[in-house]
A protein has these predicted regions:
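ATP-dependent small-molecule kinase catalytic core of the GHMP/sugar-kinase superfamily
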Residues: 90, 99-141
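A glycine-rich beta-to-alpha transition motif near the start of alpha/beta enzyme domains, typified by
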Residues: 1-111
């Protein structure tokens, strides 16, 4: 069993476990996410977010769901990520560049809050990317 320091945060109803991987390789992050995020036998969280060095931005953020699958981005997660790196003294910047699987995201700290431009929302059902086993309905119920 390894000893692992972590921080738990929440944003708008989503909760996250954060692990700093800037200096340490902690192993299989998908397996760690499954254990830490388990609400019955672990810490319990929606996602594991990890902080890594980046060659193209201030930091790199990796996100793992509770089932161990990796995802591109999470709006509430990036806000908590920005707060985490600032609160833990990893940066003094108020405007950050964070590398994600969805590209570079630029959160901005404004007082105790974090703003993120997530781009234009996709509101048209046929344009929203979906993977499903079965027919996809394109109507409001």
């Amino acid at each position: 069993m390894i000893e692992l320091q972590f921080t738990k945060m929440h944003g708008a109803g989503n909760d996250f476990v954060f692990v700093d991987c800037l200096k340490n390789d902690i192993g299989n992050l998908a397996a760690i996410a499954k254990k830490l995020c388990d609400r019955r036998f672990g810490v319990g969280a929606d996602q594991l977010l990890t902080v890594h060095p980046s060659e193209v931005a201030d930091f790199k953020m990796e996100i793992y769901n509770a089932d161990g699958s990796q995802v591109e981005m999470c709006g509430n997660g990036i806000r908590c990520f920005a707060k985490y790196v600032c609160d833990h003294g990893l940066t003094k910047k108020k405007e950050l560049e964070v590398e994600t699987l969805a590209g570079i995201i630029r959160p901005r700290l404004v007082g105790d809050l974090v703003e993120v431009d997530m781009g234009e929302p996709i509101l048209e059902g046929r344009k929203i990317p979906v993977e499903a086993d079965g027919q996809i309905a394109d109507r409001l119920l």
